[in-house]
């Protein structure tokens, strides 16, 4: 089955007309007309007025234009045309934002048909007309949504249509698309992220398989990104919400966000729209080189620990999992949390007279008996108190400002013998008992 039927299904009688632009053909600079190549569903006529729609654009509005000429691959100049490889001349088309993937259509075409024409055009352009090579013009014109769709549909096409002989060929093209999406991401003005309402942090999504006994086999945990063009159409249960991440004038906001969710929150990658189109953390950002660095000099980051904290918080009473899976994952990440706590270093809010003593080689700090200091203390429900401790400087600085300093200590260190509250959410006391402070 060819790509056309793969996307559209079997041909049916059409009373409407639509096509996706697969190629822009060069023509004289003396004319404002634009010549494009596409596969027409229905029948298009010279003189027809069509709507120009860019499904992958964040801000393009639909426009109307007139078809001034048609050329059939077999018949030459014609007054009407349908089928594949039709040349369409759009009167004054150069003044519109027409590029590969633009859909020309009549009134009344369904969203599903518009999307099918769009996908057919961009896949055909990339995989077949261009042999899997993105041109400089493509890199400039394609939105991140366009690139993600080509990437996603190429994976689908490769999985269902590729043969053993050409599978490696298509896989190579898919890797190219992933790299282009990664590069495009860092240049955007904004991107939307799926957050967990309960934790207030970017939600960690898990794709998993099931073992023979029916238990889950979880894979890496990823943060889900949504291009702006999809933010209105994506729906999630009430336990999730979309939040905007701005790139800022220096175009470093998204990069900073990625560094935070990977190195501070423990995300193991990102995914766009769904798990199909994902990029691992190693392919996104470069990890700091800690080789040979003294423990005291290492940056305070506890990604494994925070990853477990966030997953325990997310799982809770989520409606997206059954009780058996919730219990299994809760125990899994609680066990991993217990292991991570053994080697974690925390930042403790403290007020002290004079200078803080320098920590030892292990990053631990101790005071002489005559030094006066005050540890921060949190009042919890049930008249309990706990010392707030933090997994990184970002979280510490968000809650404790002037007058407070950060002291580095392991859990159970000499200066924090009390029960502790990790990042304001997890209460911990002797016996490794943990629970949500709320």
Where are these regions (language model features)?
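An interfacial alpha-helical scaffold signature
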Residues: 2-12, 112-438
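Beta-strand/loop-dominated core regions that host nucleotide or nucleotide-derived cofactor-binding catalytic loops
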Residues: 13-114
